Amino acid sequence: LGNVLVCVLAHHFGKEFTPQVQAAYQKVVAGVANALAHKYH
């Protein structure tokens, strides 16, 4: 689900969605997913 969100953001922002921005969003999404996994596992 997190990767889908990143894809939607990339499509929405176009050229403004640089590899650096993608890396930042991927890091946030991974952190949130990890936190949720630990809370509900």
From Swiss-Prot:
Gene3D superfamilies: Globins. The keyword Methyltransferase does not apply. Keywords: Acetylation, Heme, Iron, Metal-binding, Oxygen transport, Transport. One of its GO terms (biological process) is hydrogen peroxide catabolic process. It comes from the Eukaryota. Residues 1-41 form the Globin domain. The keyword Iron applies. InterPro entries: Globin, Globin-like_sf, Globin/Proto, Hemoglobin_oxygen_transport. The modification N6-acetyllysine is found at residue 39. Transmembrane segments: none annotated. Red blood cells. One of its GO terms (cellular component) is hemoglobin complex. One of its GO terms (molecular function) is haptoglobin binding. Involved in oxygen transport from the lung to the various peripheral tissues. Heterotetramer of two alpha chains and two beta chains. Belongs to the globin family. This is Hemoglobin subunit beta. It comes from Colobus guereza.
